[in-house]
């Protein structure tokens, strides 16, 4: 679950406050002491717009999130949300086509034939119908311009064109130059309002391939087995985002159109942006292009599914070619639950890569080959999982028993209270890093919107975390961790369910690579104000100091967040000594005469700091990073290692 953190001390209860510039007719909500200074608008048609300004680079990360995903798929057409995500790149009446008036009758015929096809059971008849679909699709392709959406994005200098579908959401991503907001909004509004389903059967082939690949992915099979065990009555467990083979072989364009008209409406969408822009001007542009979209006053609501308590382990077995492993999973409340904070901290205490229970007791003591723990993070329910691979001569049940022993330690409070403080510090560090990145900042908005979390609660998270006690963690663990878990054995062997979907033969379509729509030409012809480059001036932008030992120091204050980054540059590398790189890398595994490696790892984790080594031919770079407030202690600890490195014989 992605959260936003406030690194300013919140001395008062955070209240969501309405604010509005006198110069703008658009009212927005904001939260005091929000480090992102987010503005949250709601247009008259219900469209949510989340804006945060970050002028580090002249670019803007945009996400358009739709609150619909695999859990909303009709039972007879599972995989629909994911499939439609693919079709959103096929164009509209204005682009992706040379002549929509000529193309439309053919597309209508294809839609009607697919309705007949999906209801036909005789294989010979189905084959004949699909042949007709293929023939008409070829004729329709003469009018289509495949990949013109990509050309539009290239025309405005966009990067990272992509989309993803989960159980709870479908999200469309673009990273655009700061001077292309108008063009971007114009294209996206047309795309979301006037989507045309073309290239259907060829895209179906792509979806088939994705499904076929999933059938041989042992990790995905384990994931789906965990969900089916924990959520036997909820769509999380009863269906998958990719859909069943049977449903994918019987698609319905009519159902997909109804799906678009039902869910892809402004009162079920959010535009999330982070970057270099004027929020007052930006909301005007968004309203100009998206403000006329019609909401759905009858937006469906999924029936609330109350899962029955799990009273004994639900055991499942997965077969595949990957190495054997075992996974345990427990069910928890969803992302908007007040207990989400406790779950996040519990996850850090159990496994953080440095000083968690699994790290210290199992990984560092080499009791298993490998292991990890974490959460799935979904809106309606959450899941906490532990997964591990056995050593040679060890059974999957041995690993399971080791996991359960660690859970018992958690429930008994058999862990240092300082681990909780350290977990909070590291959670704070993680969120600080996210403030540095436009993609992460905008993604926080997406998570809040999809999970139904008020922004004030996101901003106040660190304040809440700082008040959590060890006893609360222990009580939480005893409340949720019992014999109520999913137990998935991943064993080596041939999976009898790996029956791939046969792809029907299709005629290669006409690509029309050199064609362009009028819409694309109009976008290409738009003149925008150029972005003026800003160059680093070493004399003005960097402060130069000299340490007591005459070592030169270059310094630049971090004005974005409370994270420091310190680089030690050693004028020696592998050209001086071939063992140099290995020697510096070995530092990560050394203790000192006063501290063991375990103690050093725990102290770095407590400080929410870490170091990395980058050996080069002529220089070696050592990077020390972490919370600014702990920089002196982290430097002292690191320099203690440099001065007194010792092999930890234990």
Language-model segment annotations:
Residues 75, 87-99:
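Metal-associated gating/positioning segment near the N- to mid-region
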Residues 208-216, 305-319, 423-434, 624-627:
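Short, conserved secondary-structure transition motifs
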């Amino acid at each position: 679950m992605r959260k936003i953190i406030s690194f300013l001390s919140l001395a008062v209860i955070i209240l969501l406050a309405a604010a509005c510039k006198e110069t703008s007719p658009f009212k927005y909500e904001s939260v005091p002491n929000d480090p992102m200074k987010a503005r949250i608008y709601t247009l008259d048609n219900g469209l949510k717009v989340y804006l945060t300004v970050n002028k580090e680079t002249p670019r803007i990360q945009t996400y358009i999130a739709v609150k619909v995903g695999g859990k909303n798929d009709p039972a007879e057409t599972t995989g629909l949300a994911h499939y439609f995500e693919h079709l959103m790149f096929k164009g509209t009446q204005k682009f992706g086509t040379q002549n929509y008036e000529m193309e439309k009758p053919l597309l209508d015929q294809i839609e009607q034939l697919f309705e007949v096809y999906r209801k036909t059971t005789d294989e010979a008849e189905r084959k004949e119908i699909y042949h007709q679909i293929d023939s008409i699709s070829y004729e329709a392709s003469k009018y289509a311009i495949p990949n013109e959406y990509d050309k539009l994005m290239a025309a405005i200098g966009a990067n990272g064109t992509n989309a993803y579908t989960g159980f709870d959401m479908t999200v469309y991503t673009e990273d655009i130059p700061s001077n292309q907001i108008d063009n971007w909004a114009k294209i996206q509004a047309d795309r979301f309002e006037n989507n045309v389903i073309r290239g259907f059967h060829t895209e179906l082939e792509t979806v088939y391939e994705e499904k076929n690949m999933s059938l041989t992915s042992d990790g995905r099979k384990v994931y789906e087995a965990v969900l089916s065990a924990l959520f036997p009555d909820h769509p999380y467990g009863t269906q998958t985002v990719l859909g069943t083979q049977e449903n994918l072989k019987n698609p319905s364009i009519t159902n997909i159109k109804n799906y678009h008209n039902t869910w892809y409406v402004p009162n079920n969408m959010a535009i999330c942006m982070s970057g270099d822009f004027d929020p007052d001007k930006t909301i005007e542009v968004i309203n100009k292009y998206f403000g006329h979209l019609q909401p759905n006053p009858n937006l469906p609501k999924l029936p609330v599914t109350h899962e029955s308590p799990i009273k004994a382990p639900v055991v499942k077995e997965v077969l595949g070619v990957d190495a054997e492993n075992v996974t345990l999973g427990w069910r928890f409340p969803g992302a908007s639950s007040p207990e989400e904070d406790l779950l996040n901290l519990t996850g850090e205490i159990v496994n953080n890569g440095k000083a968690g229970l699994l790290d210290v007791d199992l990984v560092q003591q080499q009791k298993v080959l490998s292991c990890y723990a974490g959460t799935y993070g979904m809106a309606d329910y959450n899941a906490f999982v532990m997964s591990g691979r056995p050593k040679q001569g060890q059974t999957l049940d041995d690993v399971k028993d080791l996991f359960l022993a660690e859970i018992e330690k958690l429930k008994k409070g058999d862990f240092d209270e300082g681990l909780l403080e350290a977990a909070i510090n590291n959670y704070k560090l993680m969120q600080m890093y996210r403030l540095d990145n436009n993609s992460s900042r905008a993604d926080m908005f997406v998570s809040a919107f999809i999970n139904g979390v008020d922004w004030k609660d996101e901003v106040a998270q660190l304040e809440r975390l700082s008040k959590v006690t060890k006893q609360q963690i222990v009580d939480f663990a005893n409340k949720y961790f019992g014999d109520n878990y999913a137990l998935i054995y991943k064993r080596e062997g041939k999976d009898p369910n790996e029956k791939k979907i046969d792809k029907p033969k299709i005629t290669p379509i006409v690509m029309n690579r050199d064609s362009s729509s009028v819409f694309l030409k109009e976008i290409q012809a738009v003149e925008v104000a150029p972005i003026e480059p800003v160059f680093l001036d070493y004399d003005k932008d960097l402060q130069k100091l000299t340490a007591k030992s005459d070592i030169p120091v270059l310094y630049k204050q971090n004005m974005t967040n409370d994270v420091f980054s310190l680089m030690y540059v050693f004028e020696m590398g592998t050209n001086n000594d071939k063992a140099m790189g290995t020697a510096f890398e070995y530092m990560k595994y050394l203790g000192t005469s006063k501290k063991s490696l375990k103690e050093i790892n725990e102290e770095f984790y407590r400080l929410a700091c870490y170091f990395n080594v980058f050996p080069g031919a002529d220089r070696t770079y050592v990077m020390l990073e972490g919370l600014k407030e702990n920089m002196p202690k982290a430097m002292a600890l690191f320099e203690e290692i440099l001065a007194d490195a010792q092999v930890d014989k234990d």
